[in-house]
Amino acid sequence: MTHPQPFIAVIPARLASTRLPNKPLADVGGKPMVVRVAERAREAGAQQVLVASDTQAVLDAARDHGFDALLTRADHPSGTDRLAEVAARFGWRDDTVVVNVQGDEPLIDPTLVRDVASHLAAHPDCAIATAAHPIHDAADVFNPNVVKVALDARSVAMYFSRAPIPWSRDAYQPHWPDVAAMPAPAFPVYRHIGLYAYRARFLRTYPSLAQAPIEQAEQLEQLRAMWHGERIAVLITERAPEAGVDTPADLARVQALFRPSSK
């Protein structure tokens, strides 16, 4: 009998969203969004679910619903930096698995959260684990808002990019630059899913790592870890995850799913 990998789920949440102000506190079926996310993390089997925020109202919302919460600094440039502060303050052991669950994903699949944590445990040479799913639409391959990942034989990341990787010379070159004429990929192309599991050891070192030129060019913070020699294990899942909440339209869509159906 196998036992699930023990892990801690941390939910970084900040109110300062330009497209959707006060997003973590938005009502989703009678509860704040950040609480809905925390409930999903708890369903995943996390040993501890912790909301990390620089805003007292977010912490109060989490605690009112029975979740742990920690006040963090307001000057963190990324959610990973916020996680690093949490890891340092709690003093977790180096091998503790910490999953970063985005605070704007109330529909995240608990099974995926659990599987990414287990995937990191299965790759002791990796500091990070994440997930990806196959792309079947050429438009997504060429969409810079869709982050792609190229993998080695062990499904460890070789590179993340907004560009179409890998580039199929024979399939794409005859049509370039007419993206609309591009055929669907006939070889594996994977879309990155922004869910991460970290070893606490890495989180404590992350703030001291200098930004990488490729990170600044692509605007992908996971490239900083790779630039400094860390490995990222990638779990392949066949199904695309539910979209997060970035805009008022996204929020309305999610609220409708939590609304009781009228008979």
From Swiss-Prot:
It is found in: Cytoplasm. Its main location: cytoplasm. Gene3D superfamilies: Spore Coat Polysaccharide Biosynthesis Protein SpsA, Chain A (3.90.550.10). GO terms for biological process: CMP-keto-3-deoxy-D-manno-octulosonic acid biosynthetic process; lipopolysaccharide biosynthetic process. One of its GO terms (molecular function) is 3-deoxy-manno-octulosonate cytidylyltransferase activity. Keywords: Cytoplasm, Lipopolysaccharide biosynthesis, Nucleotidyltransferase, Transferase. Pathway: Nucleotide-sugar biosynthesis; CMP-3-deoxy-D-manno-octulosonate biosynthesis; CMP-3-deoxy-D-manno-octulosonate from 3-deoxy-D-manno-octulosonate and CTP: step 1/1; Bacterial outer membrane biogenesis; lipopolysaccharide biosynthesis. It comes from the Bacteria. It catalyses: 3-deoxy-alpha-D-manno-oct-2-ulosonate + CTP = CMP-3-deoxy-beta-D-manno-octulosonate + diphosphate. It holds the Pfam family CTP_transf_3. One of its GO terms (cellular component) is cytosol. InterPro entries: Cytidylyl_trans, KdsB, Nucleotide-diphossugar_trans. Belongs to the KdsB family. NCBIfam families: kdsB (TIGR00466), PRK05450.1-5 (NF003952), PRK13368.1 (NF009905). PANTHER family: 3-DEOXY-MANNO-OCTULOSONATE CYTIDYLYLTRANSFERASE, 3-DEOXY-MANNO-OCTULOSONATE CYTIDYLYLTRANSFERASE, MITOCHONDRIAL. Activates KDO (a required 8-carbon sugar) for incorporation into bacterial lipopolysaccharide in Gram-negative bacteria. This is 3-deoxy-manno-octulosonate cytidylyltransferase. It comes from Burkholderia vietnamiensis (strain G4 / LMG 22486). The gene is kdsB.
